[in-house]
UniProtKB/Swiss-Prot annotation:
Lineage, opening ranks: Eukaryota, Viridiplantae, Streptophyta, Embryophyta, Tracheophyta
Name by which UniProt lists this protein: Xyloglucan O-acetyltransferase 1
Location in the cell: Golgi apparatus membrane
Extent of motif DXXH motif: 390-393
Annotated phenotype, changing D153A: Almost abolishes xyloglucan acetyltransferase activity
Glycosylated sites: N96, N194, N269, N319
Record-annotated disulphide pairs: C79-C129, C100-C165, C109-C395, C318-C391
Membrane topology: Single-pass type II membrane protein
Sequence ranges on the Lumenal membrane side: 36-416
EC number: 2.3.1.-
Species in which this protein is naturally found: Arabidopsis thaliana (Mouse-ear cress)
Length: 416
């Protein structure tokens, strides 16, 4: 190689470097604004979202879902939360008998001296998903500027008071209305979010008279709803319905103004018809009444008691301290739930309706009732031979808090 050729090599190298450097900005520009991988990435994400099967509940503390995912969530079935087990939860409840001021006296097991606390440290674990802890801020956001009404018997009140305790951890409710014996009609306001929460005592949902000193049986008109809540129906955005146990009492039934029959009517001159069909018709009448106007309806299924065949005043009734591990639904509990599920299925096409199916999970919690601690310090004067027990309602805090953890998921899906 001659001297001139050797001198030309650096020049050629400079030209090549210059050309390469000139093309780098152009390549970068094309990658940024015409990236051939961008469409592949977007398509992959969209396909993934389209094929997602919802297997877990979500909460505001989890990663925010995209709008595309939200749109699809509406069409996907929820994980079956009705099948599962109670597992230990070391975190415990969000409130206690001292921090919540709206607990009915008979359900404040802590203040009434219940000595064990293990019943507080369980959570419901569905077989195929997880239920997030109750998010009070999320609930209030979902119900902003809305009116939520609980309608039914003392189990509806039990669930309501659980909800108030959960919400009061972030915002104090103001009692703005109360009426009736034992404050059976009450209304609260959460000014922070303009949320109204009400409870209406209506143990049959339909019109009727409750037994009293002058009446030894209930009277039900099963073809029209109870006006005590029916007259306020247009004020409600969301309704939670919960009844059942009052239908077991003696009653005379009317339909279209005529006597239909009765249940346990030893002194009445009418036909014994039982209560199952009447319970069904009462649920049906109610769901027809609340249909329309975009109103959201949640039907809470039958909540089992745990007297286990023992008298209500027997010593040791519902004195369990742990959940059952394998008890199955049967008898009354199974039949009442079956009726509610069937009526829910029939009405779902006409009503914006969800069923809060708590029967199976609740039958596993004999430890969650007040028992003798429905009254304060029941053994302060020793152990009596007979003592009143509440094996129906739930201690607060207690298993009923789980019902509201599931309910918030229903509200979230409605708001998507």
């Amino acid at each position: 190689m001659g001297l001139n050729e050797q001198q030309n090599v650096p020049s050629q190298r400079k030209i090549i470097v210059f050309i390469v450097l000139a093309f780098i900005p152009i390549a970068l520009f094309r990658l940024c604004f015409n990236n051939p991988f961008s469409s592949i990435k977007d398509t992959s994400l969209q396909d993934s979202a389209a094929n997602v099967v919802i297997t877990s509940f979500s909460s505001s503390s989890q990663e925010e879902e995209s709008q595309e995912s939200f749109d699809h969530i509406q069409d996907e079935p929820l994980c079956d939360y009705t099948q599962g087990n109670w597992v230990r939860d070391e975190i415990g409840p969000l409130y206690n008998g001292s921090t919540c001021g709206t607990i009915k006296d008979g359900q404040n097991c802590f203040r009434h001296g219940r000595p064990d606390s293990g019943y507080l440290y369980w959570k419901w674990k569905p077989n195929e998903c997880d239920i997030p802890r109750f998010d009070s801020n999320r609930f209030l956001d979902l119900m902003r500027d809305k009116h939520l009404a609980f309608i039914g018997d003392s189990m509806a009140r039990n669930q309501l008071e659980s909800l108030l305790c959960l919400l009061s951890t972030v915002s104090s409710p103001d009692l703005v209305y109360r009426n009736g014996e034992d404050n059976k009609f009450r209304r609260w306001r959460f000014e922070s979010h303009n949320v109204t929460v009400s409870v209406y005592w209506s143990p049959f949902l339909v019109a009727g008279l409750e037994k009293s000193g002058n009446l030894d049986h209930n009277v039900l008109h099963i073809d029209r709803v109870d006006e005590r809540w029916g007259n306020d129906l247009e004020r409600f955005d969301t309704v939670v319905v919960s009844v059942g146990h009052w239908f077991l009492h003696p009653a005379v039934y009317y339909e279209s103004g005529s006597v239909l029959g009765c249940h346990s009517c030893e002194t009445s001159n009418c036909t014994e018809v039982g209560f199952y069909d009447v319970f069904r018709k009462a649920i049906r009448t109610t769901l027809r009444a609340v249909a329309g106007s975009g109103r959201e309806v949640i039907l809470t299924t039958f909540s089992p008691s745990h007297f286990e065949g023992r008298p209500w005043d027997s010593l040791g009734a519902c004195n369990m301290t742990k959940p059952y591990e394998g008890k199955v639904l049967e008898g009354l509990d199974l039949d009442m739930r079956k009726i509610e599920i069937e009526e829910y299925t029939a009405a779902a096409a006409e009503v914006r309706l969800e069923v809060l199916d708590v029967t199976a999970m609740s039958v596993l919690r004999p430890d969650g009732h007040p028992g003798p601690y429905m009254y304060a310090d029941p053994f302060k004067n020793g152990v009596p031979e007979r003592i009143p027990n509440d094996c129906l309602h739930w201690c607060l805090p207690g298993p009923v808090d789980t019902w509201n953890e599931i309910m918030i998921e229903m509200l979230r899906r409605w708001k998507v």
